[in-house]
């Protein structure tokens, strides 16, 4: 995963263990291991990653090792085995994270700036994770296919399906 060329999966993606942000953190951990993290933060340096790792009681170093060893499907099983969290605790965590609105003036301003820059007519983007998703989209939507090819047709990082990321880039 090279996060200088594409964003990690959306924080709202639940494809690994049904946990908000875990698929995104997986992409960032893989990029961290490959030294292609770009401007993204991983583990203890990232607020959302830190919340997820604390919630699961998994150290960031151990998680980084696991993403090297396991594909997404096997990682899903590994995370569930490592964590003692119940389905209801995971659902509560997800709901809380998906609904958090910016709490400080700095984060409220960051959301306003992103809205002004990328989606001035949108009034439905209100949460921290929606702001992150908007920022990812804004920073990567103008991929110039005359300068580099689209992602590999073997890339499965959108919904776990081969070719969707490539098709989306070509459609732009």
Task: Please give the residue ranges for each predicted region.
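Polar, glycosylation-prone regions of secreted, cell-surface, and some intracellular proteins
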Residues: 1-62, 66-91, 95-96, 108, ...
């Amino acid at each position: 995963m090279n996060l200088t060329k594409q964003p990690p999966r959306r924080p709202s993606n639940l494809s690994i263990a049904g946990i908000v942000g875990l698929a995104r953190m997986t992409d960032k951990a893989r990029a961290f291991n490959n030294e292609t993290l770009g401007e993204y933060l991983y583990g203890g340096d990232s607020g959302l990653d830190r919340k997820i790792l604390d919630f699961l009681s998994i150290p960031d170093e151990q998680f980084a090792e696991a993403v090297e060893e396991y594909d997404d499907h096997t990682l899903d099983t590994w995370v569930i085995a490592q964590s003692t969290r119940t389905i209801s605790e995971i659902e509560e965590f997800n709901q809380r994270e998906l609904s958090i609105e910016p709490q400080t003036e700095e984060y409220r301003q960051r959301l306003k700036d992103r809205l002004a820059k990328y989606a001035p007519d949108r009034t439905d983007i209100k949460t921290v994770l929606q702001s992150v998703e908007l920022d990812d989209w804004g920073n990567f939507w103008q991929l110039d296919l005359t300068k580099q090819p689209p992602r590999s047709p073997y890339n499965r990082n959108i919904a776990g399906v081969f070719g969707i990321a490539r098709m989306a880039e070509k459609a732009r």
